């Protein structure tokens, strides 16, 4: 069996590494990654949930001492200025697990040299490759006719380099602003991603670039490095003919809140791995589309409580409707359970061991309480 991954961005690298690692002892499986070295990976420093560092540790010998990707600790996400009840809300990850921030250029080099798959430098059409299974990870599409929009109030970002040491924080920062919110990714000054580790996210149909730049510079000590516009979207057909699978930005793009992308890439390749090697799933497309729509909904929920700013953006952001009975059911559950019982059963809690997209009940409980109950710190 031959499996080919096309593209070596975040999605392509994690796809090839997962497949190469989990099939390494199967002599009947060959994994190959083909990419154009002239096509640069994402420039912005990345943040993850816990699966990415777990895979990198297992398959590349990455660790916090031997750290060639300038990774920094991510113990959770600190929300500043969100809602009307608390100045700060901390979305804590389980204390026995650690997510990360990393430089995508250096991660690409680490993965391509892992030895778990063959690497070929070339420009190819995935649909013309002779292989049993193909993963199309060529990045954002030029034509969106086979895609649908994801609901989100953000469509632009100004990237910047910080003039302070961001690595003192062991968490991502999500700071509410009059025009949206700003991410601050703890990044070493020697990392290639340091120039792009602060991002002011906004809606270009509401705020002008000039006003946004002024607000950005007034709120943060940064040097602006790049302007980015984007769409939030998902492929209508993530799996084509049970042979070609879209992943990475070829599959979807959703604004960076909650760092959902890399976890989703790994979840999707895991679904497909199980489909190929263990049991056939006739509903692959429906499954991943539902998963990504859940990511969309959880992110939208963060805007519904507003922020300390009463502006046009925040009025607009609160208008998005979440149309999912499962979402409403879980929200009702977390309103009637203590934060301790919301812990997973494995940790001594009594909550159901479920996930909505990527989030267990304790994540839901953290946000619900932070938006509705004054936290004593």
Protein language model features and the residues they cover:
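Short, well-ordered alpha-helices that flank and scaffold nucleotide-derived cofactor binding pockets
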Residues: 17, 21-25, 113, 186, ...
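Beta1/beta-strand and adjacent pyrophosphate-binding region of the FAD-binding site
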Residues: 1-11
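N-terminal FAD cofactor-binding segment of flavoenzymes
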Residues: 38-89
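FAD/FMN-dependent oxidoreductases across multiple families
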Residues: 188, 202-305
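Short beta-strand to alpha-helix junction loop
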Residues: 47, 92-113, 137, 204-207
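Glycine-rich FAD pyrophosphate-binding loop
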Residues: 20-44
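Predominantly flavin-linked oxidoreductase catalytic cores and closely associated redox partners
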Residues: 114-216, 220
């Amino acid at each position: 069996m031959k499996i080919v991954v096309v593209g070596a961005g975040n999605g392509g690298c994690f796809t090839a590494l997962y497949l190469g690692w989990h099939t390494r002892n199967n002599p009947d499986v060959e994994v190959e990654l083909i990419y154009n070295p002239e096509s640069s990976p994402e420039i912005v420093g990345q943040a993850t949930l816990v699966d990415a560092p777990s895979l990198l540790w297992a398959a590349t010998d990455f660790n916090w001492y031997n750290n060639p990707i300038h990774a920094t600790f991510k113990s959770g996400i600190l929300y500043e200025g969100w809602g009307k009840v608390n100045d700060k809300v901390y979305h804590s990850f389980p204390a026995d697990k650690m997510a990360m921030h990393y430089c995508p250029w250096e991660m690409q080099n680490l993965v391509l040299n892992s030895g778990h798959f063959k690497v070929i430098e070339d420009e190819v059409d995935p649909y013309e490759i002779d292989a049993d299974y193909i993963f199309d990870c060529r990045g954002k599409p030029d034509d969106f006719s086979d895609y649908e929009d994801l609901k989100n109030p953000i469509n632009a970002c100004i990237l910047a380099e910080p003039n302070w040491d961001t690595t003192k924080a062991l968490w991502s920062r999500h700071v509410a602003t009059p025009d949206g919110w700003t991410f601050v990714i703890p990044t070493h000054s020697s990392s290639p991603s340091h120039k792009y580790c602060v991002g002011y996210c906004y809606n270009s149909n509401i705020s002008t670039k000039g006003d946004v730049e002024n607000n950005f510079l007034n709120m943060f000590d940064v040097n602006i490095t790049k302007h980015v516009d984007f769409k939030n979207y998902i492929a209508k057909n993530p799996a084509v003919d049970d042979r070609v699978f879209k992943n990475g930005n070829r599959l979807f793009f959703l604004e960076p809140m909650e760092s959902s992308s890399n976890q989703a890439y790994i979840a999707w390749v895991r679904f497909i791995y199980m489909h190929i090697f263990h049991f056939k799933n006739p509903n692959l497309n429906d499954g991943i589309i539902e998963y990504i729509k859940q990511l969309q909904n959880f992110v939208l929920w963060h805007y519904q409580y507003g922020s300390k700013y009463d502006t046009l953006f925040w009025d607009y952001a609160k208008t998005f409707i979440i149309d999912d009975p499962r979402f409403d059911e879980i929200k009702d559950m977390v309103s009637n359970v203590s934060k301790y019982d919301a812990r997973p059963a494995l940790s001594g809690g009594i909550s159901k061991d479920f996930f909505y997209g990527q989030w267990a009940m304790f994540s839901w409980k953290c946000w619900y309480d932070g938006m509705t109950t004054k936290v004593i710190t």
